[in-house]
Amino acid sequence: LMTKRSNAENVLGLHDELVIEPYANPFRVYPLVEDYRKFCRLFESGVSCYIINTGSYMGKTVSKEISLDVIEQVVDGTADFKPFGPIVGFDYLEYEGYPLPNFDKAYKKLIRERMQIRLNFLLAFNQKYPQTALPVGAISRLEKVLQDLES
């Protein structure tokens, strides 16, 4: 999970900083690789994954009503997803008032930077915790996303 620090957290001077939180479960007391394996089993069983921007998108606030509408479209099966530029396996949901930027050099650079942050986190994590390192597949998938953005 990549998120911004908020003033609700007990941290000094880091508000609005982009950070990686390796899990969304604050009660996890076991190695992260166990969550990774569980998620892989879910996806292998046919479960779909959706990432929803619930705070803001490209600097524009996303209201709770819009978030709920997006969730309802997914649940109802009416969401019409489109390919997300050159990134294989990534799709997006068009939403009025929230246009997808053109995949020009600047936008690709932004996405590459954000994906590189994630990749750097995984590489550092695996170096720091070699006994419970995440599988190479997690890293190679991010490397593939970065390659897709080079074209």
Where are the language model's segments positioned?
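Conserved NTP phosphate-binding and transfer environment spanning the P-loop NTPase/kinase superfamily
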Residues: 1-151
